[in-house]
Each structure stands twice: as C-alpha cells, then as structure tokens.
C-alpha cells in the first residue's frame, strides 16, 4: 500500500503491495472471470495505458480487460506525445490526471519510475519497470500455477535465463517464496544476481522440479559489450535452453512456463512451445482475466 499525493491510495507497483490473502483473492477472482463473463457499467471511468517500452501481451491484454469492464480506454502513443518534445513523465501523467483520466497503467524502462509520480492523485498499475518488477505478470503466473496445482506449499520451481535483467524473476521470487514454494535460479555466470537467491546447475535439478519457468534473453538491457559478445543462440540453447533431451527428464505432472515473447530454439526448443507440459499460451489467456481482476481491485480499493 502506498501514500501518494499526501493521502492514502491503493496502487499496484510491486508484489510487496499485496498480502498473501490479496494475492489469493485476485487469483480466485480471475478464475471466476475466466468461467463467466460479467459486465458492470463503468462508462464514467477513464484509463490510459502509457507504454514507454514495446509490449504485445501486457498492453493488449490490459486493453481487452479494460474494455470488458466497460472502461473508457484513452489512446496514448509515446511516439506522438509531447514526451518527444522533452516533457517529463510526471508532467505527462499529471496532464492526463487533470483532463479526467481516473487511473494509469504504465510500463517504463526506468526502475521504480513511479517514485517520481508521488504527487499524482490517481492510482497507478505498474506494467513493468525496467529490471525492477512486473506484478501483473507475476499474478498471472501465480494464477496459472494455482490452476494447475491448487497449492504453492512444497512446489519446486526453477527460473532459468537472464536473471540479472529480469523483472519477472524478481516479482516471482518475492511472491512465490512467500506463498510457500521453493524458488531457485539457473543462469549463465554473467547474468546471475546472487542477491535474489540460490543458483543451481540446470541438469542437476531438471528431473526434480514441478515448474520450469524460462525467461527471454533481454538483449535490450545488455549495455556491457562482454554480455553481447558472449551470447550465441546455439550455445545458450545447449547450456541453458529447454532442449528435447531435458524435456524428457521432466517428471510427470511438471509444467513449463514462459512470460513471452519466446525466442524459439533459444530458451526452448521450437517443438516444445505447445507441448503437453507447456502452459505458455495458457499464461497469455490467463493474463487478460488476471488484469481484469487487478483493475476491479484498484477501482474498488480507491472507490472510483
């Protein structure tokens, strides 16, 4: 929970903003929405989606979720906005607030960008901040896991890939550990962040995990020339990708996850993206329902 603009307001900026009870409540609400559509009249509420980084799934599923909730979605394109004239993020958001926008969904390349928005008087949903956090992705991942297993206690989860630059890894580690799962990481040495937890050898644990979560290599965040120089698709797939050989070692009942976009034959063999154990496209489907639940939650908590 956050204090912004000098008064109490409920935002969703980090997984730390949610209690375990709130996480489970959101999961159950999203599953309800998945089973049956509801259309409450909210024609008087306006939402703007500000995406300063490229996005397909997060942006479009928020848009669909907003329209399913009968919200008025205001089109905002960074490329045609006054951001191109040097306007600050705060001034852009304050302008939208002053013309009647009721809430914002924001993705930005800067970690914790929302700290500069403390004087806003409308709620913010974080659509991803740099390599910081991605709460809505984490919540849809939690929903997908709960839908499969009905629990978190005792689950063994590995997150594999570019951990150092991944907001998904950070959000999932925080929330899933709190919910009772064991989360460990697999990564090339150059993309490790030891502060997040334990790193293990992929081949030592592949046959013991319940969930194998694969991450995209985040080329756009690689500023070190060594990172770029050492990366090879073939070598990465051989050492850190889910190959067909590793897939065969997964135990019965194990599932594969990936926040997408997927680099086929890099993080995962092309033939496995829609395999029996894969939940990758189901995650995308669940994303829209979870984002509906998040929007409802923010509307209700802020009495909009």
From Swiss-Prot:
Keyword flag Transferase: yes
Amino acids binding carbamoyl phosphate: 57-58, 107, 134, 137, 260-261
Molecular function terms, GO-annotated: amino acid binding; aspartate carbamoyltransferase activity
Keyword Transmembrane appears in the UniProt entry: no
Amino acids binding L-aspartate: 85, 167, 216
Keyword annotations from UniProtKB, A to Z: Pyrimidine biosynthesis, Transferase
EC main group: transferase
Family as reported in the entry's similarity comment: Belongs to the aspartate/ornithine carbamoyltransferase superfamily. ATCase family.
Function summary: Catalyzes the condensation of carbamoyl phosphate and aspartate to form carbamoyl aspartate and inorganic phosphate, the committed step in the de novo pyrimidine nucleotide biosynthesis pathway.
Pathway: Pyrimidine metabolism; UMP biosynthesis via de novo pathway; (S)-dihydroorotate from bicarbonate: step 2/3
Reactions mediated catalytically: carbamoyl phosphate + L-aspartate = N-carbamoyl-L-aspartate + phosphate + H(+)
A single GO BP: 'de novo' UMP biosynthetic process
Assembly behavior: Heterododecamer (2C3:3R2) of six catalytic PyrB chains organized as two trimers (C3), and six regulatory PyrI chains organized as three dimers (R2).
Name by which UniProt lists this protein: Aspartate carbamoyltransferase catalytic subunit
EC number(s) on file: 2.1.3.2
PROSITE patterns: CARBAMOYLTRANSFERASE (PS00097)
């Amino acid at each position: 929970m956050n204090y912004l603009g000098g008064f109490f307001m409920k935002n969703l900026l980090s997984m730390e903003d949610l209690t375990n009870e709130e996480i489970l409540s959101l999961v159950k609400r999203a599953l309800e929405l998945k089973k049956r559509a509801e259309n409450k009249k909210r024609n008087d509420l306006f939402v703007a989606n500000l995406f300063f980084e490229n996005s397909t799934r997060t942006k479009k599923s928020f848009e669909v979720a907003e329209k399913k909730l009968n919200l008025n979605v205001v089109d905002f394109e960074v490329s045609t906005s006054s951001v191109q004239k040097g306007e600050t993020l705060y001034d852009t958001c304050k302008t939208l607030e002053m013309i009647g926008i009721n809430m914002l969904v924001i993705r930005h390349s800067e970690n914790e960008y929302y700290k500069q928005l403390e004087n806003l008087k409308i709620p913010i949903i974080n659509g991803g901040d740099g390599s910081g956090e991605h709460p809505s992705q984490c919540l849809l991942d939690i929903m997908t896991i709960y839908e499969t297993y009905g629990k978190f206690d005792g689950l063994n989860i590995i997150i594999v890939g570019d951990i150092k630059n991944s907001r998904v890894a950070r959000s999932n580690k925080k929330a899933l550990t709190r919910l009772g799962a064991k989360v460990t990481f697999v990564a090339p040495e150059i993309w490790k962040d030891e502060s997040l937890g334990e790193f293990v050898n992929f081949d030592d644990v592949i046959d013991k995990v319940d969930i194998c979560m694969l991450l995209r290599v985040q080329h756009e965040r690689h500023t070190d020339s060594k990172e770029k120089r050492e990366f090879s698709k073939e070598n990465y797939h051989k050492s850190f990708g889910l190959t067909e050989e590793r897939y065969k070692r997964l135990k019965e009942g194990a599932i594969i996850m990936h926040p997408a976009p997927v680099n086929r034959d890099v993080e995962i063999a092309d033939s496995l993206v829609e395999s029996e154990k894969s939940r990758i496209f189901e995650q995308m489907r669940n994303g829209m329902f979870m984002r509906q639940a998040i929007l409802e939650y923010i509307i209700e908590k802020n009495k909009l």
